[in-house]
Amino acid sequence: MADPQHWLITGASSGIGRLAAERLQQRGHRLTVICRSQERAEQTLGWLSGDSRVLLADLADLDQVEAIDQALLEKDEALDGLLLNAGLQYAGHRQVRWSAQGLELTIAVNHLAHQRLAMDLLPLLLRSAAPRLVITASEVHNPASGGGRVGRPAGLGDLSGLENHSAMVNGEQRFDADKA
């Protein structure tokens, strides 16, 4: 077995995040898991082992993300890996949901919170001999899931855009490299 590593994981209370966390633990690694609620934290503590720990922060509130980042930076423990897995999807909902900062909730949680974690904790990650940054998404790619049924599926269409490959935005057919 390799030397134990320290991993920070979001979205480890269920799904592929939990599976990844369980596998990392089986290999003897120490985990710091961010959970969004006390209920999720207690559930997660039920299966975490060793000196792994749970921190509370709702990724929908970037102030809470910053507080977690600052606490980890003050603790000054190197991280060998960041596994950024938490995500949500409100497919089919007519009402837009907003983060604490007034951002659309999916963007705030799935992207901005993880960007903030990665950028703020980069100094701890770079202290590792072999740092790893892993970002996952578990539903949106799957057209059979709720998240994957949003919008029209990707495709090439009728390829009519190739007929006017040099058309400018204003519709002119002439191509002028100086204006491109």
Predicted features along the sequence, with ranges:
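Rossmann-fold NAD(P)H-dependent dehydrogenase/reductase core
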Residues: A2-A180
